[in-house]
Structure formats: C-alpha cells, structure tokens
Amino acid sequence: MLEGIEREAAEHSNGCSGPAGHAPPAGAPRHDWTVQQAVALHDLPLFELIDRARAVHRAFHGEHEVQLCTLLSVKTGGCPEDCAYCPQSSHYETEVGPERMLDVGAVLAAAERAREGGSTRFCMGAAWREVKDGPAFERVLDMVRGVKALGLEACCTLGMLTDDQARRLKEAGLDAYNHNLDTSRKAYKSIISTRTYDERLVTLRNVRRAGITVCSGGIIGMGESIADRCEMLVELARLDPHPESVPINALVRSPGTPLESLPPVDPIEFVRMIAVARVMMPRAMVRLSAGRTELSRETQLLCMYAGANSIFYGDRLLTTPNPGQDEDRALIEKAGLQPMAPAAARAAR
C-alpha cells in the first residue's frame, strides 16, 4: 500500500513519474493532496525526496537566487493571545514586556537600512490578536505607504483582519500579509485557545479577496507528530491559489513559555519539511524563518537546495535572535548564491 501511495504522490507532485529529478514538473499545482500522500512523500529516502524537490524548484524558480526579507516588530509584547510558543504573550512571565508602538519615522528608517543591506521585502509585525480600527491602524497604513515609497515590497503580520481592513491595506500598497496556521488542526488545540483554526482561515480568505498575496506557514518542534506537520502543509496546499509565501519556522524555545523545555528540532526533519513544502506548493516562495540560529550552515544550505529560496535577514525576528547580516551574506557568497533582485522577486511571487 505504501508503494502505491508513494507512486501516486510522486506522479501528482508536479514531478514526473519515473526517476526523480530526470523530467521537469508540469501542469497546474495540485489542490487535492491528502495527509496520507503527504506523509508518504515526507517518508521517502531523504536523497530521493530532495531530488524531487530540487526538480520542482528548478522548473519554477531561479536555481541560485534567494530573496532577503527583513521583519520588524512595530508593536512588541502585551499580546492577549496564549500561543504557547510566544514570548510576547501576556499570559506568560518572559523577558519580553509590553512596549509602545513605534512611530512611522523609526519604522521607515529601519526599512531604509534593510534596503541598503539588500532586503527586497520589509515585513512589519504587531503583537495584536486582531486589527482594530483607529489611530494605531492608521499608523500602520502610513508605514505601508512609506515602505512602498522606498521601493520595497511591504508585508504585515497584525493578527486577524476584516474584509474592510484588508481592503484598506491593499489601497495603501500592501503586497503581502502573513498569517500562519502554525500547525495541524488537531495539534492546534494544545498550542492556542484564544483564536480558532477557522478564524485563521477566514483571515487568509479576507486577505486573498482584497488582492493581497498570502504568506502562511507554520512552526515545527512544538510536540506535534509527522502527520501533524504534513496535515498543516495539506491545509495550505488545498488553498486555491496556494499561498505565495510559505514560511517554515523551527520552534524557538523562549524562556517562560510553556514550550521552553522541548527538545530542538532535528535538522534532517527540518530539511524534509522544506522539501515537502516545495513539492506540494511549487510556485511558492518557501522561506527559512525563525530558528535558524540552531541550524548549522550546512543544514541551511541543504534546505536551500531542497527548495527554500528566501530567508529573513537581520539580527532579530520580532523578539527572537537571528543570524547577523554579515554571517548570512558570507553564507550566500560562499555558496555561490545571488540575492534576488526586486524585479525578480516580484516575478517569482
């Protein structure tokens, strides 16, 4: 039975049937993946899985390009949500306390530094459960306009959005909105109680209807099973169209959060997750996100070979550490990779 599932997964994964990597993927992306098929794909011998993912990547993306994205927390801490992984939650005693929202000038100065450092996308995050109309949202709209004026792609992650708020963000020039599913529907209940899984999907629908591109992925290493990880990717791959961006995070075990004592993510499992995401969502930008400080340079490069074509660039991701710009620049140069140009980044979305 497993062989049949593997064969079906291979034939419909936008890879051709037959030896992996010897024929280009063809046809429209699938939206009918099953968890069983995704698990079978995940469980292939590692090199076969990577070969299949690489063939898909070659067919849809530049082989040696990586997009550099910068993420800034514009409103830190004091979040009313109880996400078990997050040091910004007001439910836990962590090193991150509530801070005032940044002003527009400070955000645009950070965006200009990001552009000078080579980033082509600038994402602004706020520790909110949902966007509320009022001065804070108006400030975010001004931030988006300013980031666009700098020639950068503008992205936000602000929590739940209504249709009207999504429309206003689009009118301000927003390119992308991040709203992660985090994990599978089953595992989600043990991670978050203050927002439902379906509420997340509604926000993604509102973003899509406004004409903003969707950025949605998840976190591995929160105690979930392999099937849970694959189920999360299936949820994303069943969206039509697929998300334009799929960030894959490894849990950052923040002191004071309920998940601080969990073991680190196995690097090979992280590579597998990247490869499966690439096969299932061939046109998406697959982004190496939080947790890279615990991955070796070699693991990060293997992830890029397996289909990751974007990294978050800068020494912090919201409130968590990230490799420094000099370190990332050296890694990219040593591997012979090229930072993706803005025009190429837009064409690849």
Swiss-Prot record:
Residues 64-283 form the Radical SAM core domain. GO terms for molecular function: 2 iron, 2 sulfur cluster binding; 4 iron, 4 sulfur cluster binding; biotin synthase activity; iron ion binding. Residues 1-11 have a biased composition (Basic and acidic residues). Its EC number is 2.8.1.6. SUPFAM superfamilies: Radical SAM enzymes. PANTHER family: BIOTIN SYNTHASE, BIOTIN SYNTHASE, MITOCHONDRIAL. This is Biotin synthase. It comes from Sorangium cellulosum (strain So ce56) (Polyangium cellulosum (strain So ce56)).
